Design a protein with these regions (language model features):
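Conserved PLP-anchoring active-site segment centered on the Schiff-base-forming lysine
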Residues: 19-38, 59
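Substrate-binding/gating loop at the entrance of the active-site cleft, primarily
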Residues: 10-11, 31-47
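Conserved Walker B
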Residues: 35, 81, 109-111
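Active-site PLP attachment segment
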Residues: 119, 125-160
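Short, structured coil segments at secondary-structure junctions
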Residues: 47-48, 132
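Short loop-beta-helix segment that forms the pyridoxal 5′-phosphate
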Residues: 1-18
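Active-site phosphate-binding strand-loop segment of PLP-dependent enzymes
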Residues: 52-107
Length: 175
């Protein structure tokens, strides 16, 4: 995807914490799956956005929240494979909801990167949905056996984070 690039963080925790805090402001709405990782919860809490957790993998509940907030900036956040119980999100269904309600989709691929997809690119890659994911975050510390994490997003989002993401700016770079 030509208009995208990546940014590397020290860890998945640093990535989620800083990205969500930097991108979401007062008046915005973060809608997060109930079983999302603590780093996502902490990033949402540190932002000034309203934070609502929808019932795990419940698209009816998610759609109700989306439809009740038509005029707000909305960020849907989910893991592709959930660390809490190992099940998977319906990424195609989430892509449909984000389009229908003019929301952005943030996908944490920590537990699918290096496992799913023909080149280990994660579940969105395997499902051929990568172009529909606004923000993709994954870690090198699980299946890849390394250190750090990354975000893959449009150039303007990456450029913004380089200048505004505190967990990126105020951390020592990886060796």
């Amino acid at each position: 995807i030509d208009n995208r690039k990546a940014l590397v963080f020290n860890s998945g925790y640093h990535a989620n914490l800083g990205i969500i805090q930097a991108l979401c402001k007062k008046g915005d709405l973060i809608i997060s799956d109930k079983l999302n990782h603590a780093s996502i919860i902490d990033g949402a809490r540190l932002s000034e956005a309203e934070f609502i957790r929808y019932a795990h993998n419940d698209h009816v509940h998610l759609e109700k929240i989306l439809s009740d907030n038509p005029d707000r900036n909305k960020l849907i956040i989910t893991e592709s494979v959930f660390s809490m119980d190992g099940d998977s999100a319906d990424i195609a269904g989430l892509c449909e909801l984000k389009k229908k309600y003019n929301a952005m989709l943030y996908l944490d691929e920590a537990h699918s990167f290096g496992v799913y997809g023909s080149n280990g690119g994660g579940m969105a890659s395997e499902l051929n949905l990568l172009s529909q994911i606004d923000i993709l975050v994954a870690t090198f510390g699980k299946a890849a056996g390394g250190v750090g994490a990354f975000i893959y997003a449009e150039n303007n989002i990456i450029d913004y984070l380089i200048n505004k993401c505190r967990s990126f700016i105020y951390s020592t770079a990886l060796p």
